Amino acid sequence: FEQQQIHHCINCAAYTGVDKAESEKEKAFLINADAAGNLAAICKAHQTQFIHISTDYVFDGTSSTPYKEEDRISPINVYGASKLRGEELVFNNNSSAVIIRTS
């Protein structure tokens, strides 16, 4: 960051083993939550726009209609909980970050 003039950073890195996360909770949270929060803080310090890719697993999957940003979040597994914690840390560390939830 200090040697390059980076304007945008898109975080696509993730622990993606949805089922395996149940037995590797610490690893899932380290990658999906802690690392995302740290990267968001670094981007803020360098005035770099941070864009974080998250997931619809932050919801419980019971809605019969597409989810909206303001819908209640309620992850039902470790993977979803780790991605939700990542979103929280991203916004706590960089309030101008953008989060995109994919499905």
Predicted regions and their residues:
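Catalytic helix-loop patch of NAD(P)-dependent Rossmann-fold dehydrogenases
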Residues: 23, 30, 34-38, 58-100
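SDR active-site strand-loop-helix element
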Residues: 9-13, 50-55, 60, 100-102
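A short helix->loop->beta-strand "cap" motif at the edges of active sites that frequently abuts
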Residues: 45-49
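Ser/Thr-glycine-rich phosphate-binding loops at phosphate-binding pockets of nucleotides
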Residues: 16, 55, 82
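NAD(P)H-binding glycine-rich loop region in Rossmannoid oxidoreductase-like domains
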Residues: 1-31
